[in-house]
Regions:
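Domain-scale signature associated with acetyltransferase and cell-envelope carbohydrate enzymes
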Residues: 1-185
Length: 187
């Protein structure tokens, strides 16, 4: 009996186009994933990663799973993005965005250029403008946060922060605006 992992042919196609896959037999790639949407230029997919979704895109220089397994489901991953470990569903990561080990990024999130978080960060329906930095052990949902103009001039949320948007009676949730968004960050 010959054992082959699901998506074995797709893994072979990735390797053939130049993707670095240190341990090919540990990857799980869904049948719906379009290999043409995964760049072969300087992309590394480390052991234990799972890639699902017909809308998944992985651009050049992306690094997936360096610190632990990554599950991606219908995400758009821009150039030089580092998703070091965790679960990522229906989210967008622009150039240089990054998330540490044990991240949980759910639907509706956008991490713009060089925005990112350390380990154990949970996001849902959150937009981080360029250069926003999130510390470790954070739950940061339903937020729009302005970032800054560079890595030196940026916005940061410290570690062990929880942001829930419920009224005291628990009957309603509302989004939060953090930073100087109304005065021109969106322009």
């Amino acid at each position: 009996m010959e054992l082959k992992p699901r998506g074995y042919e797709k893994v072979q196609q990735l390797i053939h186009k130049g993707v670095s896959v240190p341990n090919p037999l540990t990857l799980d790639i869904g049948e719906e994933v379009d290999i043409e949407r995964v760049s072969g230029d300087r992309v590394t997919i480390y052991p234990g990663c799972r890639i699902y979704g017909a809308n998944t895109v992985v651009a050049s220089g992306a690094q997936l799973g360096y610190e632990g397994p990554v599950t991606i489901d219908n995400c758009q991953i821009g150039p030089k993005v580092e998703l070091k470990g965790g679960y990522f569903k229906e989210a967008v990561f622009l150039e240089g965005a990054n998330m540490g080990l044990a991240a949980h990024v759910r639907e509706g999130c956008i991490l713009e250029e060089q925005a990112g978080g350390a380990h154990c960060v949970g996001l849902k329906q959150t937009i981080l403008f360029p250069f926003v930095t999130l510390g470790s052990l954070i739950n940061f949902c339903d937020c729009l946060m302005a970032g800054g103009t560079s890595r030196k001039n940026h916005s940061e949320v410290g570690s062990s922060y929880i942001h829930f948007n419920f009224t005291p009676s628990g009957d309603k949730t509302t989004p939060s605006l953090i930073g100087d968004v109304p005065r021109g960050v969106m322009l």
